[in-house]
């Protein structure tokens, strides 16, 4: 089996200690995998400079201004992917991660890439759903963790998302028809669907083809455990930790083998974790 060249886009506003631990996980645990020939980390950051004054373990650090939640995340993701397109053209797959989204079960991660390569799938993600609303075409996809085929996405222009351009043009319609904001989860998924349409030119079978060429990570569904959009934070089968509170995260991290790094060491050794993500 050929090895994969992957790149990680880590996008951060204020969860800087989460981002550092995430990089420790990637450069120790992920890097130990025999199926990756290289892992590049592109860190896109739009917080204040004094929150994150210098690089940690990323290959590239991109600094942007923060225009707000959805647009900010969109611009960070777009900037990270643009850097990969310009600098790491031979990458096979890109992993997009929020800083507080840690994946610590290596075999689960490896199986995602093996399945995508074997079945020629272009996207791995799950629905941003809740128990009574599971249609991914309506709720969109998780954007705190997803994987995509880099060359396919580049060919069919899945990125940039250009959230601001879309928002400026259509936000009033969203408020008028749905009473809701423009969702980044839906916008990125719509760009994936558009790529499928460009490739196959089949309107009638578009939804079927979109699902057929996607690895749906149903182990994470539903992401929200009730109809009030209360988030689940831990998926043991995946080894996926997304807590905002560091204390339960730390308790789980203690049990993970083959991870190391300065930020992990500091976290596990600290009796008081009040320093974490504090600015």
Predicted feature residues:
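Active-site-proximal specificity loops/subdomain of glycosyltransferases
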Residues: 43-90
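A conserved hydrophobic helix/loop-capping motif in glycosyltransferases and polysaccharide synthases
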Residues: 6-18
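C-terminal catalytic/acceptor-binding lobe
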Residues: 168-279
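Short beta-strand-to-loop acidic/aromatic patch adjacent to the donor-nucleotide binding site
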Residues: 91-102
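Phosphate/oxyanion-binding active-site loops and adjacent basic polyanion-contact surfaces
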Residues: 15-19, 69-77, 105, 189
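Conserved catalytic core of nucleotide-sugar-dependent glycosyltransferases
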Residues: 102-191, 195-198
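Short loop->beta transition adjacent to catalytic acidic/histidine clusters or analogous donor-positioning motifs
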Residues: 4-6, 29-42, 59
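Short, well-formed alpha-helical segments that are part of the catalytic scaffolds
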Residues: 15-32
């Amino acid at each position: 089996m050929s090895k994969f060249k992957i790149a990680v886009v880590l996008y951060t506003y204020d969860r800087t200690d989460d981002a550092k631990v995430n990089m420790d996980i990637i450069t120790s645990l992920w890097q130990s995998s025999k199926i990756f020939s290289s892992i590049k980390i592109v860190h896109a950051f739009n917080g204040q400079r004094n929150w994150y004054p210098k690089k940690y373990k990323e290959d590239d650090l991109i600094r942007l201004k923060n225009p707000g939640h959805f647009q900010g995340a969109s611009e960070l993701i777009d900037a990270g992917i643009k850097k990969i397109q310009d600098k790491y053209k031979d990458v096979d797959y890109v992993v997009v991660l929020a800083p507080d989204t840690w994946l610590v079960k290596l075999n689960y991660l490896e199986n995602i890439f093996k399945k995508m390569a074997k079945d020629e799938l272009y996207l791995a993600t799950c629905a941003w759903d809740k128990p009574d609303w599971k249609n991914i075409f309506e709720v969109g996809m998780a954007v705190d963790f997803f994987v995509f085929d880099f060359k396919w996405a580049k060919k069919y222009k899945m990125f940039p998302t250009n959230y601001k351009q879309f928002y400026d043009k259509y936000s009033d319609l969203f408020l008028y028809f749905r009473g809701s904001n423009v969702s980044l989860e839906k916008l990125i998924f719509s760009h994936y669907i558009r790529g499928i349409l460009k490739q196959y030119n089949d309107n009638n079978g578009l939804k079927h083809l979109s699902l057929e060429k996607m690895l749906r990570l149903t182990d994470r569904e539903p992401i929200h455990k009730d109809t009030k959009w209360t988030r689940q934070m831990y998926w043991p089968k995946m080894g996926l930790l997304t807590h905002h509170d560091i204390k339960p995260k730390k308790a789980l991290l203690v049990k993970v083998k083959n991870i190391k790094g300065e930020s992990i060491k500091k976290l596990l050794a600290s009796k008081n974790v009040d320093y974490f993500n504090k600015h």
